[in-house]
């Protein structure tokens, strides 16, 4: 799937968008072993729920334990981040409840990454740091100084970055790879855009470029951009009609408060079940056509600051707020950005690409390349994958075998039946490590093993050419918009599937119910 736009382009953008955060995601909290309760005659043989809670276990996720210490430390980080964003911090119990939900999902994702054999080594972290520093026009040393000045240790930042890269690779494999946009869908989308000239600007993007750390400038023209935040009241799979009705009532109560004027970000932080709850519900900015149809119908005609009605999806009840919108010259601005040393903002779902219309033909240097991909897994380590490719490279350079034959025999990419042939590759079509290695090759030269988020590659450049890609860029942009439209619900479905298949014993929740019953 090396030429799969939705996986390659999105992975590239996500890794580069890992910014110099002043705070850390909740995964930065270090797990601490639970302390056993001291033995004594005054203790019952089987502790009551409240005593189990005091013992130090906040939740059990499959076979993993989340401790109270983890929850407390992560809550401190979340509280600091909310304050920096200007969002009211929920009361301690509510904050810990939200934080624990986040930790549970992070633990489930981590377990899934372990199962799939996804690992991130020090070299990959260094590579990401160099890219982030380059994008922000600073040296890695200056970047480290800024990070430490914010009160975060360099070791904490590296761990956070490693976790982010690993989770991004997991989501790419588990979610993005399953979103397939057909040529027929692209054709239909472009025809629809022709009937709506204002929206059609969204697909007239400039030629793909290497990512550059350019500050956003006010655009003179562009498509409608929409910045959304949400409050999600999740409806678990298998909920009874009474449970669904109770959750709807809860969502309606939150909607009434939002319509009345209560701060939306604070409501989201305290009540939303969405993965972006502790960012005030902020989902980021995209062209209008990049949002799911349900969201566009509910919020597409609203003005900035307005709140939608209740939106029901397969995951539950959504309340949407239009944080900002722009088009025809006004750039969309993120609401309440967290202070950070770098000019970028974190987002689970990245903003769409540049939308300025090109003037005249769009000419780029295309590379005709082929590759052999060896993926890492529980039975194929990084060292083993690299060594296998080194052995193949030696045989290729000795002239004993042909590249296409080795690709058919060994490559684990979908291009293997075609001898690893990627066709003509535009700038930006592949992830940065792959593209950098490919650009350094002369025609007919074979690279050493190259590490990317997909695994290890051997790359051979066959030829290069200058080519007008105006039509291709428009189709690529349309495909990306269609992908982004599906990404949000697909990600939420995947999270719900992870949760529904897991054993989760939430002791915080049990403790709260016990106290309510005793009142």
Swiss-Prot record:
Region (Disordered): 31-50, 196-221, 328-361
Biased composition (Low complexity): 31-45, 197-207
Gene3D superfamilies: 3.10.50.40, Porin chaperone SurA, peptide-binding domain
E.C. number(s) listed in UniProt: 5.2.1.8
Superkingdom classification of source: Bacteria
InterPro entries documented for this protein: OMP_Chaperone_SurA (IPR050280), PPIase_dom_sf (IPR046357), PPIase_PpiC (IPR000297), PPIase_SurA (IPR023034), SurA_N (IPR015391), Trigger_fact/SurA_dom_sf (IPR027304)
A GO molecular function held by the record: peptide binding
Top-level class of the enzyme under EC nomenclature: isomerase
Compartment(s): Periplasm
Single GO cellular component term: outer membrane-bounded periplasmic space
Reactions it catalyzes: [protein]-peptidylproline (omega=180) = [protein]-peptidylproline (omega=0)
Keywords (A to Z) from UniProt: Chaperone, Isomerase, Periplasm, Repeat, Rotamase, Signal
SUPFAM superfamilies, sorted: FKBP-like (SSF54534), Triger factor/SurA peptide-binding domain-like (SSF109998)
GO biological process terms on file: Gram-negative-bacterium-type cell outer membrane assembly; protein folding; protein stabilization
Pfam family, one: SurA_N
Signal peptide positions on this chain: 1-31
Domain notes: The PPIase activity resides only in the second parvulin domain. The N-terminal region and the C-terminal tail are necessary and sufficient for the chaperone activity of SurA. The PPIase activity is dispensable for SurA to function as a chaperone. The N-terminal region and the C-terminal tail are also required for porin recognition.
Role played: Chaperone involved in the correct folding and assembly of outer membrane proteins. Recognizes specific patterns of aromatic residues and the orientation of their side chains, which are found more frequently in integral outer membrane proteins. May act in both early periplasmic and late outer membrane-associated steps of protein maturation.
Entry protein name: Chaperone SurA
Source organism (scientific name): Bordetella bronchiseptica (strain ATCC BAA-588 / NCTC 13252 / RB50) (Alcaligenes bronchisepticus)
Lineage: Bacteria, Pseudomonadati, Pseudomonadota, Betaproteobacteria, Burkholderiales
């Amino acid at each position: 799937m090396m030429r799969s736009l939705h996986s390659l382009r999105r992975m590239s953008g996500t890794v580069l968008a890992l910014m110099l955060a002043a705070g850390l995601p909740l995964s930065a909290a270090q797990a601490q072993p639970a302390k056993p309760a001291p033995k004594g005659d005054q203790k019952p043989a089987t502790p009551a729920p409240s005593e189990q809670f005091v013992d130090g276990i906040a939740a059990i996720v499959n076979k993993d334990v989340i401790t109270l210490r983890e929850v407390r430390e992560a809550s401190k980080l979340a509280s600091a981040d909310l304050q920096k964003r200007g969002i009211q911090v929920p009361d301690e119990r509510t904050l810990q409840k939200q934080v624990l939900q986040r930790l549970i999902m992070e633990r489930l994702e981590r377990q899934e990454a372990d199962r799939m054999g996804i690992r991130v080594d020090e070299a990959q972290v260094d590579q990401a740091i160099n890219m982030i520093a380059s994008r922000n026009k600073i040296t890695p040393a200056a970047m480290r100084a800024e990070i430490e000045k914010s009160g975060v240790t360099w070791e904490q930042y590296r761990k956070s970055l490693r976790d982010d890269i690993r989770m991004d690779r997991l989501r790419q494999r588990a979610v993005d790879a399953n979103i397939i946009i057909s040529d027929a869908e692209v054709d239909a989308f472009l025809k629809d855009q022709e009937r709506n000239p204002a929206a059609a600007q969204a697909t007239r993007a400039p030629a793909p470029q290497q990512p550059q750390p350019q500050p956003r400038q006010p655009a003179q023209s562009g498509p409608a951009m929409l910045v959304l935040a949400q409050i999600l009241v999740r409806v678990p799979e298998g909920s009874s009609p009474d449970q669904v009705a109770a959750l709807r009532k809860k969502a309606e109560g939150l909607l009434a408060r939002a319509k009345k004027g209560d701060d939306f970000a604070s409501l989201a932080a305290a009540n939303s079940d969405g993965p972006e709850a502790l960012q005030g519900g902020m989902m980021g900015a995209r062209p209008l056509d990049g949002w799911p149809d349900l969201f566009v119908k509910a919020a597409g005609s609203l003005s900035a600051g307005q709140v939608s009605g209740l939106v029901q999806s397969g995951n539950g009840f959504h309340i949407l707020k239009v944080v900002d919108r722009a088009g025809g010259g006004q750039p969309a601005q993120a609401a309440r950005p967290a202070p950070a040393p770098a000019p970028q903002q974190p987002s689970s779902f990245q903003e769409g690409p540049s939308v300025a219309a090109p003037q005249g033909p769009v000419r780029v240097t295309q590379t005709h390349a082929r590759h052999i991909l060896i993926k890492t897994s529980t039975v194929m380590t990084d060292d083993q994958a690299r060594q296998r490719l080194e052995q193949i490279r030696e045989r290729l350079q000795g002239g004993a075998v042909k590249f296409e034959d080795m690709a058919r025999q060994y490559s684990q990419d979908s291009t293997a039946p075609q001898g690893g042939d990627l066709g003509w590759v535009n700038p930006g079509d592949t992830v940065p490590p792959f593209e950098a290695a490919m650009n350094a090759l002369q025609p007919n030269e074979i690279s050493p093993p190259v590490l990317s988020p997909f695994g290890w590659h051997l790359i051979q450049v066959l030829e290069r050419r200058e080519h007008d890609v105006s039509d291709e860029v428009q189709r690529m942009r349309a495909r990306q918009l269609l992908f982004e439209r599906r990404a949000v619900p697909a990600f939420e479905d995947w999270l719900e599937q992870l949760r529904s298949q897991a054993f989760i014993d939430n002791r915080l929740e049990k403790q709260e119910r016990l106290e309510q019953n005793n009142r």
